């Protein structure tokens, strides 16, 4: 029988014709909103839980905990529901009510704290007590491998390898790390461009991380250049 998990990935790649005024450049966007949970985060959430179960790191009675600013929480709640696991999600208090309700609808417990950094600290503390298992998207190689195994190959195949630049926001950095690794193996000349908010901008889902909170999966040598993006530019 088909599962919701079968709908994760293989999202469309479409050309942005209206936004691009340079006839010598083709800009393509991957519509990750078509994933069942509504974002690219379905890929790592499902892969992290599935891989942990296969390794025996977690059991069917394991309680999961994760810090998230939004989309990962929805994806984690969905994936945990699919695998019949309990999950608690720590989120910033300024998260939209709709996101919280969506996570709760999938069966997750949601704890609201003052910032994403506080959420990460809380998840670390709860996992250290032994009551929970933290997948830790910020340090989990299965976050990266999800994009190495699915996102990047899909883009490569859909473009038939005709890609010169890959541009990605940097939140957990799982997407840009996994795609960079794959694309550089295929063609080292492909430029990997990361986007982060300017110091005075707040863009939901991505951060300009303080050094002490940089994701452990982030390898700076895998990014050729970083662009600072204002909130107005992001919109």
Description of each model-found segment:
Residues 1-235:
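PLP-dependent amino-acid enzyme catalytic core
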